[in-house]
């Protein structure tokens, strides 16, 4: 058995464990309540056109409302209304042209992309036509935009077209700034307290959970993104890409943490890089590579073409999606194998069993809540084409944003609390390291939770004398 720095987990009673979970749920519930009361994420403004049943469509020029950096991004979508029976189903492809111009504050027109972009889009109508994304700007350089859209090659009887501008709600942007700042400050404090509590113990004596927490807490700081306000100060794609990169790094590190802990808690002593870490890094690294590739791919292509959508314009997207799902399935099976094996082998070891049960219980709660949030957001179509794309930094309401951030932050804070040593941990560890004092005449429950006799007051020595007399009589 490897020497371990003590954890507060060992000194908690059953009552304290219940209190830890209650505090976790209260904090998580507060974030959801604030999110429900918060503003909408997306604000829209519509511009409708009557085309008088003309089959010859001319280019349509659309001017956006005045924008600020708090609008973050800009989408232009279109819903086509056909002049035919609603029972008719149509699916046809047609080339669509788009030209985007920026309007400066003095009213002059600046050419963002001094050319007309041409992409093939699919119009799907079953009673009502599906929405088409015309253009998307990942960051805003100008206070207003003009988009010229061409549907000249759409050979269908058109009754009308409904164009909609979509941007982030400035009120939500301010909420996002303040709550990210709150979590950044709170995570920094928790990280410092956790490091301070372990300062008296050699890193060689840290448990695998404590070592991983020293990695996850700084990554959680990046996940909350202290550089996020730069996206409102600098007109650049870099802050948004950094945010995507930080999120993918933390989430994949969390996946790696689960694999390493459930395996490492069973393999005490030296953990070789080749046999212990390499397979886990390989599986999680593939997931990280797939998510980062899609994010960078989308960002770089949108810089040159506002019509670009990797779900529509990338022939390899289906292959990427299948690859991601296969690797995710391998990860889940491997994790379940490690959990089942650890639970079967360590269920009779008091200290290790306690670590295993607590991590499994809290992680199970977090995963159930996460799956519930995803189901409420996507419904039964959670594994359709929009799944990977929508799991990025885009949210549909404030409650969704705060629930995800609050869930992961409070999960790490709870783990940091139970894995950090208590105030008297150094003295207690010195006693436990001495075989003469370690678990002498104590059962497993007494060691973890304390016996009733230990909590009994001395009563001027009467209790001890009475116990000694009973033992003498029995002899």
UniProtKB/Swiss-Prot annotation:
One of its GO terms (cellular component) is membrane. The keyword Transmembrane applies. The modification Phosphoserine is found at residue 443. This is Transmembrane protein 181. The chain crosses the membrane at residues 16-36, 131-151, 175-195, 214-234, 245-265, 276-296, 320-340, 356-376, 401-421. Mediates action of cytolethal distending toxins (CDT), which are secreted by many pathogenic bacteria. Expression level of TMEM181 is rate-limiting for intoxication. It is found in: Membrane. Keywords: Membrane, Phosphoprotein, Transmembrane, Transmembrane helix. One of its GO terms (molecular function) is toxic substance binding. Coiled coil: none annotated. Pfam families: TMEM181_GOLD, WLS-like_TM. Belongs to the TMEM181 family. The keyword Translocase does not apply. It comes from the Eukaryota. InterPro entries: TMEM181, TMEM181_GOLD, WLS-like_TM. Interacts with cytolethal distending toxin. It comes from Homo sapiens (Human). It is a multi-pass membrane protein.
């Amino acid at each position: 058995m490897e020497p371990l720095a003590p954890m507060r987990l060992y000194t908690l009673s059953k009552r304290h464990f219940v209190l830890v979970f209650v505090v976790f749920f209260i904090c998580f519930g507060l974030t959801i309540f604030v999110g429900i009361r918060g503003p909408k994420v997306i604000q829209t403004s519509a511009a409708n056109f009557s085309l008088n049943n003309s089959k010859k469509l001319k280019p349509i020029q659309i001017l956006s409302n005045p924008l600020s950096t708090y609008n973050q991004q800009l989408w232009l979508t279109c819903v086509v209304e056909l002049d035919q029976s609603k029972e008719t189903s149509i699916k046809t492809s047609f080339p669509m042209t788009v030209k985007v111009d920026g309007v400066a504050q003095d009213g002059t027109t600046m050419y963002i992309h001094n050319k007309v972009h041409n992409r093939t889009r699919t119009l799907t109508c079953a009673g009502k036509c599906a929405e088409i994304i015309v253009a998307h700007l990942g960051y805003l350089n100008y206070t207003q935009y003009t988009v010229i859209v061409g549907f000249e090659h759409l050979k269908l009887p058109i009754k009308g077209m409904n164009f909609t501008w979509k941007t982030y709600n400035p009120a939500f942007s301010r909420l996002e700034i303040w709550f990210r700042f709150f979590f950044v400050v709170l995570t920094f404090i928790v990280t410092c307290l956790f490091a301070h509590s372990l300062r008296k113990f050699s890193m060689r004596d840290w448990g695998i959970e404590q070592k991983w927490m020293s990695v996850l807490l700084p990554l959680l700081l990046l996940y909350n993104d202290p550089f996020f306000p730069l996206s409102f100060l600098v007109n650049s794609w870099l802050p948004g890409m950094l945010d995507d990169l930080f999120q993918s790094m933390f989430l994949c590190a969390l996946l790696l943490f689960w694999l390493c802990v459930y395996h490492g808690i069973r393999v005490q002593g030296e953990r070789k890089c080749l046999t212990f870490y390499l397979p886990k890094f390989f599986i999680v690294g593939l997931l990280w590579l797939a998510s980062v590739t899609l994010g960078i791919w989308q960002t770089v292509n949108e810089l040159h073409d506002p019509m670009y959508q990797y779900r529509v314009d990338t022939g390899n997207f289906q292959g990427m999606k299948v690859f991601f799902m296969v690797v995710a399935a391998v990860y889940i099976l491997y994790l379940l194998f490690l959990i089942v094996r650890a639970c079967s082998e360590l269920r009779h070891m008091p200290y290790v069993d306690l670590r295993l049960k607590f991590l499994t219980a809290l992680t199970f709660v977090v995963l159930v809540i996460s799956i519930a949030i995803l189901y409420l957001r996507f419904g039964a179509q959670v594994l359709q084409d929009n799944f990977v794309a929508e799991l990025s930094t885009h949210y549909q309401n404030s409650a969704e944003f705060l629930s995800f951030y609050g869930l992961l932050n409070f999960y790490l804070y709870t783990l940091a609390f139970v894995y950090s040593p208590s105030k008297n941990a150094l003295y207690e560890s010195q006693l436990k390291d001495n075989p003469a004092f370690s678990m002498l005449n104590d059962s497993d429950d007494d060691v973890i939770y304390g016996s009733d006799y230990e909590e009994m007051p001395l009563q001027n020595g009467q209790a001890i004398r009475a116990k000694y007399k009973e033992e003498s009589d029995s002899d």
